[in-house]
Amino acid sequence: MTHTIAAPTSSNSAQAAQYEALLTAFYQAFAQGDGEAMAACYAPDARFSDPVFTDLYGQAVGDMWRMLTSRAQDFKLEFSGIRADEHTGEAHWIATYTFSQTGRTVVNRIHSRFVFADGKIAQQQDMFDFWRWTQQALGLTGYLLGWSNMVQGKIRAQAAKGLQQYQRQQGR
């Protein structure tokens, strides 16, 4: 079950600065394709959700980033708007890459919200326009059917299967 994470409030505390630095390090690692460094930013029992990976927990969160960064083609990341308070954070980012299954270029604009605990990311909720993503990744099929539960469900199932295969290959 996905819970909406509130936006951070204004804060000048040392804890808020630490969490802003954590998010900056997270996105710098992402831009460099370093899934291992990204995974290290999460608490062991972290939760992640987005329109594709709707509810990941613990090791699966880090494994998702390891998988995605290891398979990325023509990947470019821009990030901005990093803000944090003592408990929550947010960032905006744009991922540009080639979707391997179709060879089509995707420019995905994402807004992320975070909850922190003990110096790590405890929860992350990424929001983006799934239909827009399907249009870019799948072309005409995405434009005509990408809004439907059927197509979105197939994409989610395929992503979950890919993550499970990756985890098996890694011995997890």
Predicted region positions:
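Soluble or luminal CAZymes and related metallo-dependent hydrolases
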Residues: 18, 60, 106
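A beta-strand edge to alpha-helix "cap/lid" segment located at domain peripheries
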Residues: 2-7, 69-78, 83-172
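Short, low-complexity N-terminal intrinsically disordered segments enriched in polar/charged residues
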Residues: 1-40, 44, 160-172
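Short, mixed-charge, low-aromatic patches
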Residues: 15-25, 49-51, 68-71, 155-159
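Hydrophobic pocket/interface hotspot
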Residues: 26, 38-39, 46, 61, ...
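Hydrophobic alpha-helical core bundles mediating ligand binding, dimerization, or RNAP-core interactions
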Residues: 23-26, 30, 42, 61, ...
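Alpha-helix initiation/capping motif
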Residues: 12-15, 54, 103
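A solvent-exposed, acidic/Ser-Thr-rich amphipathic alpha-helical stretch
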Residues: 35-39, 43-89
